[in-house]
């Protein structure tokens, strides 16, 4: 304890004197080691030092009040003038240093320090470190890492991956696939299909159909119809009409007219004649000269002059 206090009071300036005195004692080396450790901030080891230093003054005589050479005045009475040579050869006893006035230890020392503590412990070590921590742990590990993380996880995995992703998903799936695509889509669908195609289109439609066809066309139309037909034709026309008929014919003509009638006949001539020279009604065998006057005779179909009786019959 005395050596400890001396070391604390005088610091490194008294190291030489203190160490010289410690060399006379077998315990000096051990005590020096602990004093040296205490000098660099390990004052909590004071109680340990006190225990180790108790034996240092047991062989001393007196209380060492004079502080000269560690021997009391009564030792002088034991020596006489004839013992000066012996005095020089005598091994000096350990010098007991002065105690502090109050005899109290360092008030800042830790009274709970472990006397068996490791003297080589790092003074800057984390006091809150887990004593059960893995000594082989990675010192560069992420302190914010998930303690419940999968230890078998892929270290090269994408850190931005979706944590809610399907763990059974195809690892060879297309990473550029549309995330909004229809999950029920046909996997055998044509990859070159028109993405703008009508989703309501007839799946049984003719794949060779005209893409420019009229979307408003009659679905019941004749598939064998003439593709060159007049698109402005009368849809109500007679399908049995003569295809060789005169396209310039009078649409208001009498459908019951004589097809053998004179096409050059006067259309303004009255059929109901009132004298000679007029055509007789209901006589298809008669041919009348429309330009003849009343005195002209009516000719028959053979261009013969009729008899008077024949004329009178029709008059």
UniProtKB/Swiss-Prot annotation:
Compositional bias segments (type: Basic and acidic residues): 69-89
Biased composition (Low complexity): 104-268, 291-303
Post-translational modification: During host cell invasion, proteolytically cleaved at the cell membrane in the region I by a papain-like cysteine protease of parasite origin. Cleavage is triggered by the sporozoite contact with highly sulfated heparan sulfate proteoglycans (HSPGs) present on the host hepatocyte cell surface. Cleavage exposes the TSP type-1 (TSR) domain and is required for productive invasion of host hepatocytes but not for adhesion to the host cell membrane. Cleavage is dispensable for sporozoite development in the oocyst, motility and for traversal of host and vector cells. O-glycosylated; maybe by POFUT2.
Region listing for Region I, in residue ranges: 96-100
Sequence repeats: 107-110, 111-114, 115-118, 119-122, 123-126, 127-130, 131-134, 135-138, 139-142, 143-146, 147-150, 151-154, 155-158, 159-162, 163-166, 167-170, 171-174, 175-178, 179-182, 183-186, 187-190, 191-194, 195-198, 199-202, 203-206, 207-210, 211-214, 215-218, 219-222, 223-226, 227-230, 231-234, 235-238, 239-242, 243-246, 247-250, 251-254, 255-258, 259-262, 263-266
Region of interest: Required for the binding to heparan sulfate proteoglycans (HSPGs) on the surface of host hepatocytes: 88-95
UniProt KW keywords: Cell membrane, Cytoplasm, Glycoprotein, GPI-anchor, Lipoprotein, Malaria, Membrane, Repeat, Sporozoite
Membrane topology: Lipid-anchor; GPI-anchor
Record-linked InterPro entries: Plasmodium_CSP_Invasion (IPR051860)
Superkingdom assignment: Eukaryota
Location of region: 40 X 4 AA tandem repeats of P-N-[AV]-[ND]: 107-266
Composition bias type Polar residues, residue spans: 269-285
Subcellular location: Cell membrane; Cytoplasm
The protein's role, per its UniProt record: Essential sporozoite protein. In the mosquito vector, required for sporozoite development in the oocyst, migration through the vector hemolymph and entry into the vector salivary glands. In the vertebrate host, required for sporozoite migration through the host dermis and infection of host hepatocytes. Binds to highly sulfated heparan sulfate proteoglycans (HSPGs) on the surface of host hepatocytes.
Similarity remark: Belongs to the plasmodium circumsporozoite protein family.
Record's comment describing the protein's domains: The N-terminus is involved in the initial binding to heparan sulfate proteoglycans (HSPGs) on the surface of host hepatocytes. The N-terminus masks the TSP type-1 (TSR) domain which maintains the sporozoites in a migratory state, enabling them to complete their journey to the salivary gland in the mosquito vector and then to the host liver. The unmasking of the TSP type-1 (TSR) domain when the sporozoite interacts with the host hepatocyte also protects sporozoites from host antibodies. The TSP type-1 (TSR) domain is required for sporozoite development and invasion. CSP has two conformational states, an adhesive conformation in which the TSP type-1 (TSR) domain is exposed and a nonadhesive conformation in which the TSR is masked by the N-terminus. TSR-exposed conformation occurs during sporozoite development in the oocyst in the mosquito vector and during host hepatocyte invasion. TSR-masked conformation occurs during sporozoite migration through the hemolymph to salivary glands in the mosquito vector and in the host dermis.
Listed name of the protein: Circumsporozoite protein
Organism, as annotated: Plasmodium falciparum (isolate le5)
């Amino acid at each position: 304890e005395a050596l400890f206090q001396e070391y604390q009071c005088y610091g490194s300036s008294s190291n030489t004197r203190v160490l010289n005195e410690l060399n006379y004692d077998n315990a000096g080396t051990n005590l020096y080691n602990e004093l040296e450790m205490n000098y660099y901030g390990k004052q909590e080891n004071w109680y340990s030092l006190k225990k180790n230093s108790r034996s240092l003054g047991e062989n001393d005589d007196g209380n060492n009040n004079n502080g000269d050479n560690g021997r009391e005045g009564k030792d002088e009475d034991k020596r006489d003038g004839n013992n000066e040579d012996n005095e020089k050869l005598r091994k000096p006893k350990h010098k007991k240093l002065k105690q502090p006035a109050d005899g109290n230890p360092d008030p800042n020392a830790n009274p709970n320090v472990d006397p068996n503590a490791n003297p080589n412990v790092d003074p800057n070590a984390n006091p809150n470190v887990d004593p059960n921590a893995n000594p082989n742990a990675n010192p560069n590990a992420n302190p914010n890492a998930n303690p419940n993380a999968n230890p078998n996880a892929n270290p090269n995995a994408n850190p931005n991956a979706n944590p809610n992703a399907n763990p059974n998903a195809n690892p060879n799936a297309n990473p550029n696939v549309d995330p909004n695509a229809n999950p029920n889509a046909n996997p055998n669908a044509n990859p070159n299909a028109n993405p703008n195609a009508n989703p309501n289109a007839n799946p049984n439609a003719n794949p060779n159909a005209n893409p420019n066809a009229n979307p408003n066309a009659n679905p019941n139309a004749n598939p064998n119809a003439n593709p060159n037909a007049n698109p402005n034709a009368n849809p109500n026309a007679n399908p049995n009409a003569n295809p060789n008929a005169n396209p310039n014919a009078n649409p208001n003509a009498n459908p019951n007219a004589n097809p053998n009638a004179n096409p050059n006949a006067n259309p303004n001539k009255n059929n109901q004649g009132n004298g000679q020279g007029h055509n007789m009604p209901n006589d298809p065998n008669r041919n009348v000269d429309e330009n003849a006057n009343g005195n002209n005779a009516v000719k028959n179909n053979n261009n013969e002059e009729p008899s008077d009786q024949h004329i009178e019959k029709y008059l």
